[in-house]
């Protein structure tokens, strides 16, 4: 079967019964996996494409930005976008630095010309703080029925070999990344060429452990495995990086013949197997299926490849199992391979392995600055050509023109030489980008972020990467001119901590930090620092005197300020930190930032897992961002106190603790819980966000009996965190009434409530409250929690009339979406307690009549419940307008999308938060 596009590839592999599966592991669980046949993949991709076609503003050729945190969703929606006639663009994970993240998203929007963006509900907050891209959660798209490919509406012609199939980006979350257009023909030529390099045995599989935004994952593994009619296995990177032994276990378990690992991970495997070799009973893995461990992205150390190869040979792999190579996004990943490593490189006494010769579909040359080919052995600029090489960057004509020579060769930006056997050895880069653990990073972006740190003189910081002697991967160094005096040790330490945190948030790597004198940082006549000269001086040891002095001053400061644990949690965490990071007690205390001890991203992941394991927490209990922003034992212990401490009632729940503006206080809806606010809070990045949760959920707690009791509790909770105004409060549905009462109490004590929001609740509610008995409260709760549909909850209201509480509860649980039930960690007693809290909240408002007034109000209104009003217009003009009787100024009304129960749900939270933020700004908040 001749393949003219990627869709034909999937149809071909799906038509064969013996073509393999897509095996997917979830985060934190390498014991269980889900397996999908290629027929399953084709089926769900077509269903998803039909759902996509119904999306407004979508037409053939549209770019669809895919932003997912798991392999399966990326795979499904890549194919769905393709079958819908669109161009999928797979997004890398965003930077943890908010300003870099926002700038990156805005650049994506501009580059891709305002694309539709698909994501998951749980990571919608990645798009907080910006308006350039409005994400759509795929959970909101309805995938109905089975649709065959033949039944798809043919709204556009089948793509040809020259048509674009995929957009990938040249770098991760930092730097001005370019969109690389990969055509159907280019990708097919690439996977054909890769598969020709070395034959693989039958009944084996491919293993991938990086995100699908990486060209090696989607082309070298996902698409090549389909071309080879083999199973492909996808595992989250964190599970592999934090446990190299897991990598070996999966190679054995799935009879993997082809995978990849950059040099830094090869070094981790070598260290693991070296330690294993010293055990009384060393562990053995059956790796007889393993033929090909592609390695690239950074230089391969020959000694590392040699030693690891010896270990792998003992488990059944061939001596040349490690295959160093060269590839870029522009060449569909690896395209030049060294299939004779390590023997070829040992025979030439090479410190770093050659990357080998070209596969079919690509040619290389090394040239001088005038693009003249150089003879073998001479170092020059690496250039490539052939069917595997891309043709253009998306929406970037100038970058495309700059990337190619007049005779059509692609300028890689790498330096190297070709030896007499036609093997390429890389010697460096013509560009300044840094490659850390195989990922490109822009030093300019990092320097811009560093300039905001008080201890640095603006424009006098320089960031570069270097390969340390005996190292396994490049490391980052930051040199800077300090603003503090040399003997101000506290400022020296604070500046080093701030630099380390900034670089780690951007790159996942802890830098070497070195303050220098002005004389050591000369500028050119144009006022610029020379990165190349500074790097060369550092590598030659010209800054050794500064380095030794700085190390001694930092040691003295840490020694004089050593802090001991103040409680059991701090003591426990300190033990976990020192053991996990293999550091001594005298080098680390509860106030030492983890970045000071040389931690890298792999060690950070392992530390996170070790803490969770030691504290008996779930694998995802501690967000990585928490560990990065609470970088000392003491700070982390404080952040974890809520999880470790006793469950005493406190109405205040912190949803977002950072920001320079006054907090926003959100009062729970009639269900009493504040889960509904979590997604909304993640978009409010410039102020703390607190929620007020009803009493009665914890063991031994009794629900509030009166509105006055609840109001006083919430008032005290607010004043304990924010003693004085101006205040910003809002309530959702029932919570609007309580927010109104709290606002009155604050004003009665002389405080200013500058913003008071009502999310879709009128002032007069007692008649509606009286309609809600325990059964109705439970059914509303079930619908509110997505356990049952709105239609089913209405049907059950009739069906369950006259039944006991136990019978009603039995029916609700039997009708519940059990996956959602489990996701919420519900059980029968908890559901009963929740229904009791909801009922008591409604009961205490049976006789509620609003009274008094407040300064003003913002009313956010959506489509009302059918029982409340016949239309949105009636709801706004007849019911909600009555707030005018209880405000000293005319209320402001904000028309928002969605229905009563969905207005701040996943479908509409993005547009809602924009309206809310604007309303806060207009009120001077």
Swiss-Prot record:
EC number(s) reported in the record: 2.3.1.-
Phenotype of gene-disrupted mutants: Abolishes the production of aspulvinone E in hyphae, but not in conidia.
InterPro entries, A to Z: AB_hydrolase_fold, ACP-like_sf, AMP-bd_C_sf, AMP-binding_CS, AMP-dep_synth/lig_dom, ANL_N_sf, PP-bd_ACP, Thioesterase
GO biological processes: fatty acid biosynthetic process
Pfam families: AMP-binding, PP-binding, Thioesterase
SUPFAM superfamilies named in the record: Acetyl-CoA synthetase-like (SSF56801), ACP-like (SSF47336), alpha/beta-Hydrolases (SSF53474)
The entry's keywords: Phosphopantetheine, Phosphoprotein, Transferase
Domain Carrier stretches: 564-644
An example Gene Ontology molecular-function term: transferase activity
Annotated metabolic or biological route of this protein: Secondary metabolite biosynthesis
UniProt-annotated stretches for the region Thioesterase (TE) domain: 663-909
Region (Adenylation (A) domain): 15-436
Catalysed reaction, written as an equation: 2 3-(4-hydroxyphenyl)pyruvate + AH2 + 2 ATP + O2 = aspulvinone E + A + 2 AMP + CO2 + 2 diphosphate + H2O + H(+)
Tissues/organs with expression: ApvA specifically produces aspulvinone E in hyphea, in contrast to melA which produces aspulvinone E in conidia where it is converted to UV-protective Asp-melanin.
Chain positions found as O-(pantetheine 4'-phosphoryl)serine: 601
Function: Nonribosomal peptide synthetase; part of the gene cluster that mediates the biosynthesis of aspulvinones. The nonribosomal peptide synthetase apvA is responsible for the production of aspulvinone E, the core structure of aspulvinones. ApvA first activates 4-hydroxyphenylpyruvate (HPPA) through its A domain to AMP-HPPA. The HPPA unit is then loaded to the T domain and eventually transferred to the TE domain. Upon loading of another HPPA unit to the T domain, the TE domain promotes the enolate formation on the unit attached.
Cross-referenced PANTHER family: LONG-CHAIN-FATTY-ACID--COA LIGASE (PTHR24096), MALONATE--COA LIGASE ACSF3, MITOCHONDRIAL (PTHR24096:SF267)
Family: Belongs to the NRP synthetase family.
This protein's domain notes: ApvA has an A-T-TE domain architecture. The adenylation (A) domain recognizes and activates the aryl acid substrates, and loads them onto the thiolation (T) domain. The thioesterase (TE) domain shares the missing condensation (C) domain function, and is responsible for condensation and final product release.
Name of the protein this chain belongs to: Nonribosomal peptide synthetase apvA
Organism in which the protein naturally occurs: Aspergillus terreus (strain NIH 2624 / FGSC A1156)
Gene (name only): apvA
């Amino acid at each position: 079967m001749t393949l003219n596009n990627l869709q034909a590839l999937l149809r071909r592999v799906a038509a064969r019964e013996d073509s393999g599966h897509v095996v997917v592991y979830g985060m934190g669980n390498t014991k269980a996996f889900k397996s999908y046949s290629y027929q399953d993949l084709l089926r769900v991709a077509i269903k998803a494409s039909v759902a996509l076609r119904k999306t407004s503003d979508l037409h053939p050729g549209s770019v669809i930005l895919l932003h997912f945190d798991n392999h399966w969703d990326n795979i499904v929606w890549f194919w769905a976008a393709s079958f819908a006639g669109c161009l999928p663009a797979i997004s890398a994970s965003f930077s943890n630095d908010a300003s870099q993240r926002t700038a990156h998203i805005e650049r994506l929007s501009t580059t891709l010309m305002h694309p539709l963006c698909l994501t998951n509900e749980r990571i919608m907050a990645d798009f907080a703080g910006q308006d350039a891209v409005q994400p759509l959660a795929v959970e909101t798209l309805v995938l109905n029925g089975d649709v065959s490919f033949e039944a798809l509406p043919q709204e556009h012609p089948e793509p040809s070999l020259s048509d674009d199939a995929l957009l990938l980006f040249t770098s991760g979350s930092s730097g001005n990344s370019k969109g690389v257009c990969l055509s159907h023909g280019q990708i097919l030529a690439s996977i054909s060429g890769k598969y020709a390099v070395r034959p693989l045995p039958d009944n084996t599989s491919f293993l991938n452990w990086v995100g699908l935004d990486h060209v090696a994952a989607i082309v070298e593994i996902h698409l090549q495995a389909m071309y080879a009619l083999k199973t492909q296995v996808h595992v989250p990177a964190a599970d592999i990086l934090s446990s190299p032994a897991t990598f070996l276990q999966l190679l054995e378990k799935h009879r993997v013949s082809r995978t990849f690992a950059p040099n830094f991970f090869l070094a981790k495997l070598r260290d693991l197997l070296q330690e294993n070799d010293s055990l009384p009973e060393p562990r053995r893995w059956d790796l007889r299926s393993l033929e090909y461990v592609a390695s690239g992205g950074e230089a391969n150390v020959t000694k590392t490849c040699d030693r690891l190869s010896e270990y792998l040979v003992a488990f059944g792999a061939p001596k040349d199992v490690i295959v160093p190579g060269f590839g870029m996004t522009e060449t569909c990943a690896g395209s030049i391979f060294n299939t004779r490593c390590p023997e070829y490189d040992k025979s030439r006494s090479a410190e770093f392995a050659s990357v080998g010769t070209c596969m079919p579909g690509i040619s290389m040359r090394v040239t001088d600055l005038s693009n003249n080919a150089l003879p073998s052995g001479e170092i020059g600029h690496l250039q490539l050509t052939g069917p595997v090489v891309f043709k253009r960057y998306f929406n970037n004509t100038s970058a495309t023109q700059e990337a190619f020579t007049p005779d059509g060769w692609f300028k890689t930006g790498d330096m190297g030489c070709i030896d007499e056997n036609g093997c390429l050895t890389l010697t460096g880069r013509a560009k300044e980008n840094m490659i850390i653990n195989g990922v490109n990073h822009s030093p300019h972006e990092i320097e811009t972020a560093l300039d905001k740190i008080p201890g640095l003189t603006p424009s006098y910081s320089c960031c570069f990467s270097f390969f340390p002697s005996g190292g396994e991967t490049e490391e980052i160094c930051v040199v800077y001119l300090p603003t503090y005096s040399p003997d101000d040790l506290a400022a020296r330490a604070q500046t080093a901590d701030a630099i380390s945190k900034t670089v780690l948030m951007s790159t996942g790597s802890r830098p070497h930090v070195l303050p220098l004198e002005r004389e050591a940082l000369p500028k050119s006549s144009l006022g610029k620092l020379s990165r190349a000269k500074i790097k060369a001086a550092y590598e030659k040891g010209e800054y050794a005197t500064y380095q030794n002095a700085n190390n001694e001053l930092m040691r003295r400061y840490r020694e004089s300020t050593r802090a001991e644990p103040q409680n059991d949690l701090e003591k426990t965490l300190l033990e976990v930190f020192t053991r996990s990071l293999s550091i001594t007690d005298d080098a680390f205390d509860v106030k030492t930032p983890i970045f000071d001890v040389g931690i890298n991203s792999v060690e950070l992941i392992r530390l996170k897992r070790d803490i969770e394991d030691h504290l008996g927490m779930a694998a995802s209990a501690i967000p990585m961002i928490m560990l990065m922003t609470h970088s000392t034992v003491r700070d982390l212990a404080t952040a974890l106190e809520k999880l470790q401490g006793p469950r005493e009632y406190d109405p205040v729940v912190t949803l977002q603790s950072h920001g320079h503006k006054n907090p926003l206080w959100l009062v729970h809806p009639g269900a009493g819980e504040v889960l509904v606010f979590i997604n909304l809070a993640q978009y409010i990045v410039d102020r703390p966000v607190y929620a007020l949760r009803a009493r009665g959920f914890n063991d031994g707690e009794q629900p509030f009996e009166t509105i006055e009791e609840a109001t006083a509790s919430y008032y005290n909770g607010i004043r304990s965190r924010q003693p004085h105004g101006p205040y910003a409060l809002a309530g959702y549905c029932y919570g609007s009434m309580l927010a109104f009462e709290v606002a009155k109490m604050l004003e009665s004590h002389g405080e200013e409530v500058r913003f008071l929001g009502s999310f879709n609740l009128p002032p007069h509610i007692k008649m509606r409250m009286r309609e809600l008995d325990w059964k109705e409260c439970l059914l509303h709760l079930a619908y509110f929690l997505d356990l049952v549909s709105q239609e089913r909850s209405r049907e059950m209201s009739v069906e369950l009339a006259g039944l006991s509480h136990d019978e009603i509860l039995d029916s609700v649980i039997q009708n519940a979406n059990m996956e959602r039930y489990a996701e919420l960690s519900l059980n029968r007693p908890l559901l009963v307690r929740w229904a009791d809290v909801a009922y008591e909240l409604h009961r205490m408002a049976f006789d509620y009549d609003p009274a008094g007034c407040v300064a003003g109000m913002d009313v956010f209104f959506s489509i009302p419940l059918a029982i409340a009003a016949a239309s949105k217009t009636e709801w706004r003009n007849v019911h909600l307008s009555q707030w005018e009787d209880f405000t000293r100024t005319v209320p402001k009304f904000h028309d928002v999308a969605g229905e009563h129960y969905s207005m701040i749900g996943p479908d509409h939270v993005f547009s809602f938060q924009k309206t809310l933020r604007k309303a806060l700004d207009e009120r001077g908040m």
